Amino acid sequence: MATTQPMGAVNPKTGMTHEEIREFVRNHFEEFVNRKNLGIGKVNFAPEFVDRGTDVPPGMPPGPEGAIAYVGGALKKFPDMRVEILDMVAEDDKVVVQNCWTGTEAATGKKYEFSGIVIWRIAHRQLVERWAYLTVPKLVA
């Protein structure tokens, strides 16, 4: 059950305020995807990280290694991939993000776009759980 956290208060579960967890997630997307800094995953993902996203391919390794491999594979397929955050809400130890992804497929030169909702659970200043619901990629003119 979600609890309302007073404005500016540090949540003992996350070690951060709501504004800080929003900024943490914003920076994670910017570094990990837009700047293609896969190494930040070793810092941001907790060792016990679990990815519950519907987009995760079967056989992906668990933990941070799986998340890094998944995004690394996507960046090879779409080297110019970018994510734009459209909206973000923080409550208790979770951040919900509405975003739009774009990228040009390296093999075909075709540009794609998809959107989604990603929910992150944060504990002790790290990402510990992810749920993602994404649209089917569509061709963009």
Where are these regions (language model features)?
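Domain-length accessory/inserted modules outside core catalytic folds
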Residues: 61-64
